[in-house]
From Swiss-Prot:
Organism field: Cucumber green mottle mosaic virus (strain watermelon W) (CGMMV)
GO biological process, any: transport of virus in host, cell to cell
Keywords for the protein's UniProt record, in alphabetical order: Host cell junction, Host cytoplasm, Host cytoskeleton, RNA-binding, Transport, Viral movement protein
UniProt-listed InterPro entries: TMV_movement, Viral_movement
Source taxonomy: Viruses, Riboviria, Orthornavirae, Kitrinoviricota, Alsuviricetes
Protein name: Movement protein
Ranges annotated as biased composition (Basic residues): 231-240
Region (Disordered), start-end ranges: 221-264
Length: 264
C-alpha cells in the first residue's frame, strides 16, 4: 500500500472535480464522452539536493492510444519528512509542465511544506488538457526547493507521492457544433448524421457571432451577418467566395498579437 492510498482514492473521486450528469451515471462507459480514470498508482520521488526538478509519470497505466486528448482534472501530492521532528526549515513543492520554457509559466500548482508537519497531502484542480501525443512524452515534473533544512549532501530528507485523476476524450471543444448536437441527442461519442438534425444545426450557425477582427479585415462580412440575423425566416447559404492571393495572405495573419510567445 502506498503512503496515502486510502486518502488519495477518496480525494480523487470524479464528482469532487466535475459535475457528473445522470446520463453519465446510467450509460455504459462506451457511450460516455469523457472516460474518467482514477489513478491509484503513484510516483515516489526523493528530494536530495537544495533544488530538484524530478520527472514524474502522472499517466502510468493509462491507455493513450484510443483518445486524442487528456484532461488533468485533479492532482493529489502527499509527502513525508524523513528527518527528526526537531528539524527546522521546509520545502516549496510545485508540479511543473516542462513543455514551457519558463518554470514560472509551466507551474500548475505550488505549495509550501514545513518540516514540522510530518505528513501532508494537498489537492489541486488543474483542469486543463493536453494532446495525447504530448502526454505520451511525460511532460510533468516535480520542482522541489529545500529551505533551511540542515541535512548533509547526499541524503534524502523528503519523500513525495503524486496521484492524479484524468479524463480522456476525443473532443475538448465545448462550444462547437459537434458538442451542441451531441448535447441535444445523448452523451455519445459516436459519429452523428447531421442531415437529420437541421433544426439544431441551423440555429447554431445563426447564433454564432462573427469576430470583430474578421469583420475589420473583410467588411463584406457585415452584410452577410445582417442577412442571417433575422428571425422567423429561412436563410440560404451565402455564396462561396473565391479567395484571391491577397485575402489568403491576410488570413494567415494572427488576429491577436498578444498570443505570440516572447520566447526565442
Amino acid at each position: 500500500m502506498s503512503l496515502s492510498k486510502v486518502s488519495v482514492e477518496n480525494s480523487l473521486k470524479p464528482e469532487k472535480f466535475v459535475k457528473i450528469s445522470w446520463v453519465d451515471k446510467l450509460l455504459p462507459n462506451y457511450f460516455s464522452i469523457l472516460k474518467y480514470l482514477s489513478i491509484t498508482d503513484f510516483s515516489v520521488v526523493k528530494a536530495q539536493s537544495y533544488e530538484s526538478l524530478v520527472p514524474v509519470k502522472l499517466l502510468r497505466g493509462v491507455d493513450l492510444t484510443k483518445h486524442l486528448y487528456v484532461t488533468l482534472l485533479g492532482v493529489v501530492v502527499s509527502g513525508v519528512w524523513n528527518v527528526p521532528e526537531s528539524c527546522r526549515g521546509g520545502a516549496t513543492v510545485a508540479l511543473v509542465d516542462t513543455r514551457m520554457h519558463s518554470v514560472a509559466e509551466g507551474t500548475i500548482c505550488k505549495f509550501s511544506a514545513p518540516a514540522t508537519v510530518r505528513e501532508f497531502s494537498v489537492r489541486f484542480i488543474p483542469n486543463y488538457s493536453v494532446v495525447a501525443a504530448d502526454a505520451l512524452r511525460d511532460p510533468w515534473s516535480l520542482f522541489v526547493r529545500l529551505s533551511n533544512v540542515g541535512i548533509k549532501d547526499g541524503f534524502h530528507p523528503l519523500t513525495l507521492e503524486v496521484a492524479c485523476l484524468v479524463a480522456t476524450t476525443n473532443s475538448i471543444i465545448k462550444k462547437g457544433l459537434r458538442a451542441s448536437v451531441v448535447e441535444s441527442v445523448v452523451s455519445s461519442d459516436q459519429s452523428i448524421v447531421l442531415d437529420s438534425l437541421s433544426e439544431k444545426v441551423e440555429p447554431f450557425f445563426d447564433k454564432v457571432p462573427i469576430s470583430a477582427a474578421v469583420m475589420a479585415r473583410d467588411p463584406s462580412y457585415r452584410s452577410r451577418s445582417q442577412s442571417v440575423s433575422g428571425r422567423g425566416k429561412r436563410h440560404s447559404k451565402p455564396p462561396n467566395r473565391r479567395l484571391d492571393s491577397a485575402s489568403e495572405e491576410s488570413s494567415s495573419v494572427s488576429f491577436d498579437d498578444g498570443l505570440q510567445s516572447d520566447h526565442t
